[in-house]
Amino acid sequence: MNTKQLHREWISIFEKEFSKKYFQKINSEVNNCSSNELLCPKKENIFKAFEKTNFTDLKIVILGQDPYHGNDQANGLAFAVSENQKTPPSLRNIFTEIKNDLNHHPQTKKNLEFWANQGVLLLNSSLTVKLGTANSHS
């Protein structure tokens, strides 16, 4: 896993975990995934939530279950998808609730990086899944 993407503050928070056996095992399994076991999101996006949201800027955590498991659907932020993807029902529901509750249509793209850059940590409880298999790494 590419932990170099993490903000410096997250690295100092997590660095003790990086040397523990459980983390090394997870890291080894992710790095050894063959093309037959593609991960969602792509390996370079596994820690994207910690890349886009700095710890000192953190305002709120929105927790999802696991990444979308469709091909090129998950981008590393919970509920977010790349702009070229169809809006999934869960994200559509979030946008609908914001509109209904605040009488305001969210001015953000489906990739939700605008929110992440403002201190919204969009984190899934499971950072990866196997392509095509929901809850496969729970």
Regions found by a protein language model. Name each.
Residues 1-14:
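Generic N-terminal amphipathic, Lys/Arg-enriched alpha-helix
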Residues 16-138:
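A polyanion-binding, active-site-adjacent surface
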